[in-house]
C-alpha cells in the first residue's frame, strides 16, 4: 500500500500509524524483505559477539541483581527477564562493539533498537497472559515497519543535524521506530499505535557526551527499544498516549528536538510519510565492516588506499617519519568524532568515537576491528605518537547529502613530501554491502563465539524466516550460554 502527502490538518502521525496497521506482507517488495532478513542476521551476529564483552557482562550482572525472573530471553545467556529488562540487555549487546548497522542520512542503529523490542514483544505474545504464536513472516513485517519509520522521523529533523548539536540521534529517532514495530507485531489498531508512538516519543532522548568516559553509550539505543516496547504494551491495554506527536507545535516531538537548529523550516513533518510504501528505507540501512563509528569509515578507507599506494611510506617501521596528518570531515562527523583526546588511554567507547585514534589504529594495525579497542592498543605508544600528529577539521565538501561519511586525508612527511587521498562515500554506503558479504561477516563473527552447528541453524532459520510458523524457534537458538 502507499499513502499520499499529509492531510490538510497536518496529521502525519495518524497517516504513519494507519500505514503501520494496514501494511501487508504482499505490500513489501521481495528484495526489501530479503534485505530485512540479512539485517536481522547482522544484528544477531553483533549481539552474540557483544554479549560477553566486559561492559555487557557488567550490565547483565547489574540487571540480574535486581530484576526478577521473567519469560523473555537474552542473547547469549541462560536467563529470562521481564520484557523491558530483556530489551535493555539485548539492545546493549547489539550495540556493544560498534559493528551494528547505521543509517548515514538519519543516524541511528536500527538493529539495536528494533530486534530487542520485537524479540520481547514476540515472547509477550507467545508466553504472556494472552498466548498467541508469532510467525516468522509477522516478525519480518514488523521489522520492516521499524526500518522504515526511524529514518523517516530522522529526516523530518534534518537527519544528522541532531547529532551535530550533541544529541544522540539514534535513541531519539529509534523510540518511535520501536513503538511502530512493536505495535505492528502486537496487532494494535491505528489509534492504539498512535498512542504507543506518543508514549515512546515522550521518553526519547540521549546525550552524545556518553561517548567519552563511560559505558552508557552502549545502552542508549536499548533505551529506545524499551521506550517503544513499553509504549506499545501500555497502548495495547488502552492507555492513551500523546496524539499527533509529530504534528503538535507546542510540546511536539519534532518541535522540541529541533529547537535552536537555525533551520527554515524548523522541521519537516511531511518527511515522516513522504513516499511511504513507494521508496524503502530498509535498503538504505548500511552494514559496517569496521568496528567503529560509521562516520569514520570513509577516513579508514582513504588511509587504506594510501597504505596500498605508498607501501614503503606507510610501512609500520616508517610511521615515525610522518610529520602531520590532517583529516577533513563533514560537519556532523567532525562534531561527533573530531575531538582531541584529553586523556590517555581512551576508553574503548572513546576510541571507537574518535577520528584521530581510529586513523592511528588503521595505520599501525592495518585494520579497525575489535582487537584495536583492547587495552594494549588503546595505550599503544605507536598509536599515540600518530594521534599527537593528527588534526581533524571540518570541510564543507562532505556536507552535501550522501557524503556525510566521506573524508580527505593529507599526510605530510619529515622530508617534505605530502600525499593525500579522498573517499566521498565509503563501502557500505556506495556501493552497499551485498547480502553475500553480510553472510560472510555473520559467519566470521559468529564462529568466534558459537560452534558451527549452532551457527548454521541460526543462519538457516533467519534466511527462511518467512516460512517459520513460530519465531520463538529462532529466539531459542540465540539465547542460552555461548
From Swiss-Prot:
Superkingdom of this protein's organism: Eukaryota
One term of GO molecular function: lyase activity
Enzyme Commission number(s) of this protein: 4.1.1.-
Entry keyword set: Lyase
The UniProt record lists the keyword Nucleotide-binding: no
Residues in coiled coil: none
One Pfam family per UniProt: MmgE_PrpD_N
Gene3D superfamilies in the cross-refs: 2-methylcitrate dehydratase PrpD
Record pathway: Secondary metabolite biosynthesis
PANTHER family (alphabetical): 2-METHYLCITRATE DEHYDRATASE, 2-METHYLCITRATE DEHYDRATASE-RELATED
Free-text function comment from the UniProt entry: Cis-aconitate decarboxylase-like protein; part of the gene cluster that mediates the biosynthesis of oryzines, natural products with an unusual maleidride backbone. The two subunits of the fungal fatty acid synthase oryfasA and oryfasB probably form octenoic acid. This fatty acid is most likely activated by the acyl-CoA ligase oryP to give octenyl-CoA before the citrate synthase-like protein oryE catalyzes condensation with oxaloacetate to form tricarboxylic acid.
UniProt record similarity statement: Belongs to the PrpD family.
Official protein name in the record: Cis-aconitate decarboxylase-like protein oryM
